[in-house]
Amino acid sequence: MTNIRKTHPLMKIINDSFIDLPTPSNISAWWNFGSLLGVCLIIQILTGLFLAMHYTSDTLTAFSSVAHICRDVNYGWLIRNIHANGASMFFMCLFLHVGRGIYYGSYLYKETWNIGVILLLTVMATAFVGYVLPWGQMSFWGATVITNLLSAIPYIGSTLVEWIWGGFSVDKATLTRFFAFHFILPFIILAMVVVHLLFLHETGSSNPTGLDPNSDKIPFHPYYTMKDILGLFLMIIILLSLAMFSPDLLGDPDNFTPANPLNTPPHIKPEWYFLFAYAILRSIPNKLGGVLALLASILVLLIIPMLHTSTQRSMAFRPISQTLFWMLTANLIILTWIGGQPVEQPYITIGQWASISYFTIIIILMPLAGMLENYMLKPKFP
């Protein structure tokens, strides 16, 4: 008799996705982040659900309700700290996952890559509206500054901003709708993740060499289930260490002050995972230009497949491209640092140069490096 997991309509889908899935035998730990992101999403949805049971989305009580969760709800402090730091873990895994995709040429699976970029944007939107909910100073002013950017859109900008606010400033209506968005978006993300996996399983995973892996595949279970569990334990240890020993390490002290529309914090800045994009936004001394650069900093990922000029898929055997990749990584770290600094010299100039080099490396230097490497690999004798 055939095993039920191979015949039952639902079990068959699970079996073909997580058990009998043919997987390249040589994928490294860089391929662990997909499963870690799945776990992060589940952790965020579960902790978020329990937080939503005690949170009130009203300007008068939102801040107090978060304090109430931390003080009076059983393990509320832990649930809140896991949720807040879980977002940081989520983005850390996301950035490493995208970086892996760029390094090993995973973007050549265009459908998987494109839905992945849309997922990244959706997760960023979810994190932004979520950050507004505790209704601290940085929540309020972050919401005011970022939503105000839409007013740079010609003709419809001002109307659009007031429509999103539900009034003439960030107020009760804004908080209520942001809570609604923050509740629904993770479930939309979950559906998109299924589509992401669907596209991935059409082609199968790539591998570090960039060569066709079809000649040597192994079943996902037990090999990669065990490998994923190891990665999962490491991530959980880091997350729990953060949540229990230094839960406020990555937060902003200003958010411990209730929102006050009459008092602007000296430095308005988002959470660390948005700082690179915020630095690019601030480096352009024009509102509309800054907004376009901000969008371009993420949307540039969509054109990466078109900029692939190399005859090899992976960067594993391409030292010039590797150097550029690590320059890009260092550049993003510099942008993240600059995004958290005040708008004064020398930070302004550093931010502008880092923003220029970010786009230059991706759009100009990487395609040129691919062409140069192709030329260097050509036999020079008849």
From Swiss-Prot:
It holds the Pfam family Cytochrome_B. Keywords: Electron transport, Heme, Iron, Membrane, Metal-binding, Mitochondrion, Mitochondrion inner membrane, Respiratory chain, Transmembrane, Transmembrane helix, Transport, Ubiquinone. Heme b b566 binds at H97, H196. One of its GO terms (biological process) is mitochondrial electron transport, ubiquinol to cytochrome c. A ubiquinone binds at H201. It is a multi-pass membrane protein. InterPro entries: Cyt_b/b6_C, Cyt_b/b6_C_sf, Cyt_b/b6_N, Cytb/b6-like_sf, Cytochrome_b, Cytochrome_b_C_euk/bac, Cytochrome_b_N_euk/bac, Di-haem_cyt_TM. Binds 2 heme b groups non-covalently. Its cofactor is heme b. Gene3D superfamilies: Cytochrome Bc1 Complex, Chain C. The chain crosses the membrane at residues 33-53, 77-98, 113-133, 178-198, 226-246, 288-308, 320-340, 347-367. Heme b b562 binds at H83, H182. It comes from the Eukaryota. It is found in: Mitochondrion inner membrane. One of its GO terms (molecular function) is ubiquinol-cytochrome-c reductase activity. GO terms for cellular component: mitochondrial inner membrane; respiratory chain complex III. Signal peptide: none annotated. Component of the ubiquinol-cytochrome c reductase complex (complex III or cytochrome b-c1 complex) that is part of the mitochondrial respiratory chain. The b-c1 complex mediates electron transfer from ubiquinol to cytochrome c. Contributes to the generation of a proton gradient across the mitochondrial membrane that is then used for ATP synthesis. Belongs to the cytochrome b family. Heme 1 (or BL or b562) is low-potential and absorbs at about 562 nm, and heme 2 (or BH or b566) is high-potential and absorbs at about 566 nm. The cytochrome bc1 complex contains 11 subunits: 3 respiratory subunits (MT-CYB, CYC1 and UQCRFS1), 2 core proteins (UQCRC1 and UQCRC2) and 6 low-molecular weight proteins (UQCRH/QCR6, UQCRB/QCR7, UQCRQ/QCR8, UQCR10/QCR9, UQCR11/QCR10 and a cleavage product of UQCRFS1). This cytochrome bc1 complex then forms a dimer. This is Cytochrome b. It comes from Didelphis virginiana (North American opossum).
